[in-house]
């Protein structure tokens, strides 16, 4: 994310007021307003990297203003993947270079596979270069990896190392998906202490609650889990929405839950629901696309197009 300076804010205001020409204008576009869920014809004025104005007014045009004639085209916000795996099948840098061409601007990715391969120090180097990626990455830090350390070996991270990542790098926004949720239900000190620390820093806790009953979901939510991407039936979706989880509906290279769940979404409030990729094979990225493909498939399975995008 590019931080604004005071000079930047003043420049945005001057462009928005029509006092100076924008650097770029997208003209005569059909614009999707995600707040009112309406589509209107208008212009978008851009100053440097920021949108300064959206509406019907015509701006002053400077000698260096880039004008894009968008007549007949729809303009929508950049796509966000709220649960991906940018570290599993490819280098995050080359992944970012490709998916930005498919409309993605932000990706939340679990980092346990990357960290398992390159270690904590390698992951920190990735974080240090994050401003050079073509999309904004947000990362989940593994708090339970390997999932069952008594069987699979020692914990990848100490609680202090997790705390350092959360404290020093704003891109680390969550504990990555907790697949061994039975350890939470059994009240293991090790994992609960990590969850408490994360919540004390206002970080999210990604759930992986496949197969959890409504009663078990209650306990997991009470323990601090904030989301889940493992709804595969109508009851799963409704239970997670009811309990206040950020509820993610998946269309990935491994499995898709759209056919069962997209018709259900239309009957529920969507404020806490989102479409996610949960990992896409490289061949599928090249042949089908990324979140643009996810949105198209959701529409194919009956989701309202505007709802699918927002």
What are the residue ranges of the model-derived segments?
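Glycine-enriched alpha-helix->loop->beta-strand junction motifs that scaffold or abut catalytic
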Residues: 104-105, 169-172, 219-227, 242-248, ...
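Divalent metal-binding pocket/active-site signature
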Residues: 177-234, 251, 255
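Di-metal (Zn2+ and/or Mg2+/Mn2+) metal-binding site signature of metallo-dependent hydrolases
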Residues: 73-96
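Hydrophobic faces of well-ordered beta-strands that scaffold small-molecule active sites
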Residues: 78-86, 107-109, 137-141, 173-176, ...
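Divalent-metal coordination cores built from histidine and acidic residues
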Residues: 2-16, 94-204
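Divalent metal-coordination and catalytic microenvironments
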Residues: 29, 49, 72, 83, ...
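His/Asp/Glu-enriched, well-ordered alpha-helical/loop segment
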Residues: 264-310
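Histidine-rich, glycine-flanked metal-binding segment
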Residues: 2-25, 30-76
